[in-house]
Amino acid sequence: ACRACEYCETGWETLCERQHNTGYSVNGTYAEYAIASAPFAGRLPDSVDFVTMAPILCAGVTVYKGLKETEAKPGEWVTISGVGGLGHVAVQYAKAMGLHVVALDIGESKLELARSLGADLALDARADNVVAEVQNATGGGAHGVLVTAVSPPAFAQAIACARRRATVSLVGLPPGDFPTPIFDVVLKRVTVRGSIVGTRRDLAEAIAFAVEGKVKAHVTPRPFDDVNAVLDELRAGKVDGRISLTL
């Protein structure tokens, strides 16, 4: 980021219009070494394992910031839509932040994973009564909803699961548009907020949770030669947790 615009000067460098993003405007990091701007490089303790820490620097800070954007307070409820590579980390961050968690997904293995990570309630998002169950469990709806899922029904469901004056934070990037149930948004005064990765401050905080052992991504190391196969598996939705490519 430029460090000189109104966004950078107020701590919102992720909104800088002149920022560079690896894999987009500059080369990515499918390499043994990469050049980074020192002021924007995260600091890791010598004791950490790079393979297990790698997802924290992307998925971790993304969901941590997304949870902060819901403005849910300790003791309140958040619903996390999607328990995949992002969502399984989000459950852990939410619990570490003192929040009660309802996890939604469509696979029993994902729901079992959410329960094992501390979710107070894990529900099949396809069930006819899932919204009613969320409303009942949370006493009127979640105070915050984090949407990591990329299916259009997940967004409408997120609005339905939110209580009045809740904030729905969107971190997933699905193709196309998400239809908005505007009647519910207006009537319940729900805030819908996009969130993209996180700032340097967010990154430092996300790393701290992981270093203290409160958050640990499920990582499968794979050799770099498998890169194309891994990408195919990602597109097919066959990856649980995260994969770290090793050289």
Label for each model-derived stretch:
Residues 46-128, 132-133, 146:
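Mid-domain Rossmann-like dinucleotide-binding core that forms the NAD(H)/NADP(H) cofactor-binding site
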Residues 133-143:
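A short acidic, Gly/Pro-enriched loop at the edge of an enzyme's catalytic core
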Residues 172-188, 200-206:
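Rossmann-fold NAD(P)-binding glycine/threonine-rich loop
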Residues 71-72, 138, 161-163:
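A generic alpha-to-beta junction signature in SAM-dependent methyltransferases
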Residues 1-41:
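Glycine-rich phosphate/adenylate-binding loop and adjacent beta-alpha elements
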Residues 127, 149-150, 172-173:
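Short glycine-/small-residue-rich Rossmann-like dinucleotide-binding loops
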Residues 156-160, 200-247:
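C-terminal hydrophobic helical "lid"/dimerization subdomain
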Residues 166-167:
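Glycine-centered, small-residue-biased loops immediately flanking beta-strands
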